[in-house]
Amino acid sequence: MTIKHTQDLAQIRAMVPEMRRVKAIHFIGIGGAGMSGIAEVLLNEGYQISGSDLAANAVTDRLADKGATIFIGHEAHNVAHASVVVVSTAINEQNPEIQAAREKRIPIVRRAEMLAELMRFRHGIAVAGTHGKTTTTALVTQIYSEAGLDPTFVNGGLVKSAGTNARLGSSRILIAEADESDASFLHLQPMVTIVTNIEADHMDTYGGDFENLKQTFIDFLHNLPFYGQAILCIDDPVIRELIPRVSRQVITYGFSEDADVRIENYRQNGQQGQFTVVRKGKANLDITLNIPGRHNALNAAAAIAVATEDDIRDEAILRAMANTQGTGRRFDHLGEFETGNGVAMLVDDYGHHPTEVDVTIKAARNGWAEKRLVMIFQPHRYTRTRDLYDDFANVLEQVDVLLMLDVYAAGEKPIAGADGRSLCRTIRSRGKIDPIFVPDSQTLPSVLANILQDGDLVLTQGAGDVGKVARHLAALELNIGRMQQI
């Protein structure tokens, strides 16, 4: 599907009707990646933006620098001047700002509803799936940017090449990560949808029924217009099963022989992946991808499939793949450091589902086979740890050394037997490795100092505050002497 592009920002703003009676938009939980991205785009469109969160971070600081009003803490008076309030699913009904908005009859909308409003009059490209959404969104954005098409994008993580997770572009293209965690992606009505994979996650949203989750993805694909396109990973067994139920044009990608956009001859050399993309009726592309792992080759193939259908030049695709810097906390190479006992490499990764952890381990093994793999893992949510307990144990026992933090609760109450200590006990009983439970992340540097060896690859893994642990270790430069003093 070829679309007409324009570079005139004033023309685009004229094309996209404003929310006429809305002047001031308030975001509760503005520090989150998904919320901050929408806030930044709306701020650049000229709306008055305010928002609140429990703590300041780099995202809230950046928004404040751009002119947003940021409140630390949730108070009723924060919404006093708002025309509309945007909330994330992490915010409960007892929040004083929600209660104040209801009393004042200020409209309250979910994050996805506001994203849908941004997408309504644009050429929307939505990226959905259990894993790989953020990286795929970044790769699509990189291709369209390399082609000179200046897209608007809203991503769930930092696009390193842009230095932000969202930006208002001058064309009518909007590339957005679509979140299935609360089924709110059903508000979106894109022109093109990528689905990377479908696995059992966020099952509380779907009543514990995987069939319900699958049907929700089908419903989401049917939000496409009849002339829209579904770009689907045929390697995923659930997607392959669902394709006959999709009544829109389907373009498949993957390593599978019957994929419309097929990956061949994948090989990894350290941080880079190299492979050939075979496209029906088009020249093959010999890709050098500047991020590692077969899973990222799949993410790249999805982006290439979209770009190919939109007649983007092959040269732009090749440049985007070679130049991509990846996304924040996705196999994020933080450096190689002289430890005082040799040299060690530090990588940080956001993956928090067993499948994500597994592909990250494989990428580390394939690129640095000679290194001892030391993982610092933080489980995310008690419910996920409970529901995928055996899968976590199976994946985590693949590393050479495992330091286990306790569960990052994300607002959940503890569940007996679904915690870091229990997971350690289960893995230890299997006899492959002897994990070390570290109940206090503040003591982790000193624990790591006692086991670090020359040539180690230290991989911090998880969606909670383990990313802060990674940055702390990087600031200490993995120096054994400095870590022992913590």
UniProtKB/Swiss-Prot annotation:
Alphabetically ordered keywords of this record: ATP-binding, Cell cycle, Cell division, Cell shape, Cell wall biogenesis/degradation, Cytoplasm, Ligase, Nucleotide-binding, Peptidoglycan synthesis
SUPFAM superfamilies named in the record: MurCD N-terminal domain, MurD-like peptide ligases, catalytic domain, MurD-like peptide ligases, peptide-binding domain
Taxonomic classification: Bacteria, Pseudomonadati, Pseudomonadota, Gammaproteobacteria, Vibrionales
Subcellular localization: Cytoplasm
Gene Ontology CC, one term: cytoplasm
Protein EC: 6.3.2.8
Entry function: Cell wall formation.
Catalytic activity, reaction form: UDP-N-acetyl-alpha-D-muramate + L-alanine + ATP = UDP-N-acetyl-alpha-D-muramoyl-L-alanine + ADP + phosphate + H(+)
Source species: Vibrio cholerae serotype O1 (strain ATCC 39541 / Classical Ogawa 395 / O395)
Source superkingdom: Bacteria
Binding residues for ATP: G129, T130, H131, G132, K133, T134, T135
Metabolic or biological pathway: Cell wall biogenesis; peptidoglycan biosynthesis
Keyword NADP: no
Chief place where the protein resides: cytoplasm
Protein's name according to its UniProt entry: UDP-N-acetylmuramate--L-alanine ligase
NCBIfam families: murC
Family: Belongs to the MurCDEF family.
GO BP terms: cell division; cell wall organization; peptidoglycan biosynthetic process; regulation of cell shape
Pfam family, one: Mur_ligase
MF term (GO), any: UDP-N-acetylmuramate-L-alanine ligase activity
Claim: Cell wall biogenesis/degradation is one of the keywords in the record: yes
